[in-house]
Amino acid sequence: MLKKTLLAATAFLALASGAFAEDLKEFRVGIIGGENEADRLKSYQCVVDQLPAVLGVQKVSLFPAADYDGVVQGLLGGTLDYAELGASGYAKIYLADAKAVEPILTTVQTDGSMGYYSILVARKDKGFKSVADLKGKKLGFADPDSTSGYLVPLVTLPETVGAPVKEFFAETGFGGGHENLVLEVLKGTFDAGTTFGSGVGDFKDGYTSGNLRKMVDKGILNMDDIVELWKSPLIPNGPIVVRSTLNTDMKSKFKDYMMNLPKSDPACFSAIEGGDFKSFVEVTPDFYKPIIDARKATIGG
C-alpha cells in the first residue's frame, strides 16, 4: 500500500513539474482587433525579441484576434498569458470568471490623466452639425466588447439625445474594430460612428493619441474629412492583464519589465501603446468597478 502511495505521489510530482516546465517554455500574448494584423504584429515585435530573456522562456508568441472577443475567450480559456484590454473587455472577463485574469497595470498620459474618451464622428460632407442631426440615421459601433466603441456610448448617448440608442437611430451595426469602423463611416456604410481618442490637443490632429491619431499617423485618415459630433465623459484606461494561474515569479518579472519599459526602451513602449503616454501605474479590479457595473446592467456578461 505504501509503495503504491509513493508511486502515485511520484507520478503526481512528475506531472506537476512537467506542467510547470511547460508553463515556462512559451509566453502567449493576445492582441485585440482594431487595426490591421500586420501593424499589430509589428508593434509587438520588440516584446517578442525582449521577453524570452526577461522571463526565461524559449519563445514569445503573438496571437492577434480578429475581434475583441477572440482575446477575451483566450484569456478565459487559459490559452493566453498577457493582453492589453479595454475596460469593457476586462469587465466581460470579470463577470464570466472574476479569477481568470489579474489587472496589474494601466497607462498614464503625459498630462497625468488615466483616461480617454469615446468620440462620435461623421463625414464632414454629410453636413451634420450636432448629434441631434443623426436622428433616424445609421450609427456604427466599433466592437461589442469595446468600452469607447460600444458600452460607454450605449450608456451615455441617451442622456444627450433624450432617448435610447435603438429608438433614436434608425439602425445600428458594428464596424469590426475602431480602424475599420472609421473607414466604414468614410465609405458611407454608417452615417456616424464611435471611436476613441485622448481628447487632449486638437481634433484636427486626431488629438494626441487614440485611434484617430493612429490613423492619421499611418496616412489612412485626413481629419479634414470628418467632424466630431459628441464626446463622452472620461473613460478609465484599460488594463494590462495576466493569467491568474501564471506562476508568481513570472508575473513579477513581467510586471517589472513593463513598469520599466517607458525608460528602458521608449521606442518599444511607444510602439505598443501609441501616442501620448508616459508610464504605467498599478491597478486593481476596484479601478474598473464602474465599468463592470455598467456592463452588467446594460449588456450582461
Positions of predicted regions on the chain:
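Pocket-lining segment of extracytoplasmic ligand-binding domains
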Residues: 138-140, 144-247
